[in-house]
A protein has these predicted regions:
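Alpha-helical cap/lid subdomain in secreted, periplasmic
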Residues: 1-114
Length: 114
């Protein structure tokens, strides 16, 4: 996983959207952990932290921590939220993901409603 490339491309997207559609809000999710990709989890956490830092500096970008809800109390990836490939979410995983995104999206959007 090339962290710098991923973040650079995200920054380019943010810049392009700001230039061409300046009132457009951008929501970026943390990289989702998975058992099948534990070998890149440290890099994924780093990318997520950098996405969060970008959002802190740009009022049109909101970071949603969609990774933490998939971790157990010890910080390990939960095992019962994936289908057999240990990458894609099962029904319970998708429910967690959807609720997490909604919880991050709704408060961020409400400030633009008034």
């Amino acid at each position: 996983m090339n962290e710098d490339l991923i973040v650079e491309q995200f920054e380019q997207i943010v810049s392009k959207v700001a230039q061409e559609l300046p009132r457009t809000r951008i929501y970026v999710l943390a990289v989702k952990p998975s058992i099948s990709r534990l070998h890149v989890w440290d890099a994924a956490r780093s990318v997520s932290a950098r996405f969060s830092a970008i959002a802190e500096l740009n009022p049109m970008v909101t970071f949603i921590d969609s990774a933490s809800p998939f971790l157990d109390s010890s910080g390990s990836v939960m095992g019962d939220i994936f289908v057999g490939d240990n990458l894609h979410l099962n029904e319970m995983g998708n429910e967690i993901w959807g609720a997490t995104i909604k919880a991050g999206l709704m408060p961020a959007e409400i400030r633009f409603e008034y």
